[in-house]
Amino acid sequence: NGILYMQVLQRDTKVSGKGSDDNRSYLLALEPKTGKQLWKTYRPAKARSESLEAFSTPIPYSHDGRDEIVIVGGDCLTGHDPKTGSELWRWGTWNPSRITHWRLVPSPVAGNGVILACGPKRAPVFAIKAGAKGDVSSESKSVAWNSEGSRDGVTSDVSTPLFYRDNFYVLYGEGRDKM
């Protein structure tokens, strides 16, 4: 639709190898031809230190007639209205003990009514049901499935999964697995 969406980790004037607790990330929409800012939405997070950081990319996703931008980072996965940036839903339960060194690399991927998000550092892969509203972190019904307890603990610390021909593919460890 001619709009560029990006996640930005805003740092204060201090620069360090680790994030600091006052970093604020946001999702930004720009008009590509002019660079004009269309909207900016801050993404509050309970994450601390390095766990605030993410190298993920926002993804557009449409399900049951609802368009949204999905992004992961700061120990949470969120869906946003692409026209306004407002947060539609939030899920974040893969780091309940608030480990501080869980920087996230893989981007989410979506298909068949679920949004796949990989936790960092060998944490499980989670499939969150599309169409959520509000904070669904405590709702077990919002999770379609996860890889906890699966053979070899399927996870992806760096590679973004692939949705292809109605299947999700996750590259992990020494091999590959189709979920």
Label the model's feature ranges.
Residues 1-179:
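Noncatalytic, solvent-exposed loop/strand surfaces
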